[in-house]
Design a protein with these regions (language model features):
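Intrinsically disordered, low-complexity boundary segments flanking structured domains
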Residues: 1, 32-34, 111, 155, ...
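Catalytic-core regions of glycoside hydrolase
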Residues: 124-131, 135, 139-223
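Hydrophobic faces of well-ordered beta-strands that scaffold small-molecule active sites
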Residues: 9-15, 43-47, 81-85, 123, ...
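Active-site groove signature of glycoside hydrolases
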Residues: 82-92, 111-144
Length: 223
């Protein structure tokens, strides 16, 4: 509890908030996990905001109050968010619904003032929105199959995230969608939940010795 503490680096929790249905308890998981791991001096929270039941709807003032309550608690605890917005909580076609590209763009535009307001509590924003858990695969609408859609969503995300903050993508090919736009490309960094020590069917060809792995190794020190 009294160890080294830096809200921009360190251990992290993982929390998820259903923005519509958890409006009365948006900080519940954050509070529980913070208490559970208090001895570890956790300084970051992987923060998922699920807009699952808001597809096709404008985000309301109540929705923003729900998300703000979460960020207010982060500030109280001295933590920062590794932030991701998503809609679909299952994969392989099992999600009940998913947004169109246009619906994603509309929500992103609404989120711009919220992100600006809370930028000091955000370490980085992950390029969620598309597919299962915002991982850019398995979307109901098949959005991951369109290079144009992915590039458009990514470019829009970069336009609404404050310039002081980077955006993380899971795979180098997503970053490479904007290779011809250096001012945007340089703000893209990487995250991957499945980098492993040996080749695996789920590693998306991200193991040592592949071009993707080499790109991450080469570019990550500068991001």
């Amino acid at each position: 509890e009294n160890g080294l503490y830096n809200p921009g680096r360190g251990f992290r929790l993982e929390t998820a908030v259903d923005v519509l249905h958890e409006k009365d308890t948006p900080t519940k998981e954050l509070l529980e996990l913070s208490e559970k791991y208090v001895a570890d001096s956790v300084s970051l929270a992987q923060s998922y905001f699920y807009l699952t039941y808001l597809i096709g709807e404008k985000l309301s003032e109540e929705n923003f109050q729900t998300m703000q309550a979460y960020f207010d608690e982060l500030q109280k605890q001295g933590k920062k968010a590794v932030l991701r917005f998503a809609y679909e909580r299952d994969f392989m076609g099992r999600a009940a619904a998913g947004p169109t590209g246009e619906q994603i763009l509309e929500h992103l535009e609404q989120l711009k003032p919220f992100l600006e307001k809370n930028k000091d509590l955000i370490l980085v924003v992950q390029a969620g929105m598309i597919g299962a858990w915002g991982e850019w695969h398995s979307s109901i609408q098949g959005l991951e199959n369109s290079e144009e859609t992915k590039a458009t969503v990514l470019e829009k995300l970069l336009s609404v995230v404050p310039e002081e903050r980077n955006v993380q993508v899971r795979l180098p090919e997503f970053k490479n969608l904007l290779k011809d736009k250096p001012e945007l490309y340089k703000r893209l960094s990487f995250h991957d939940d499945f980098i492993v020590i040996r080749p695996d069917r789920w590693d998306a060809d991200m193991h040592e010795g592949t071009a993707k792995f080499d790109q991450i190794v080469a570019e990550s020190p500068y991001l």
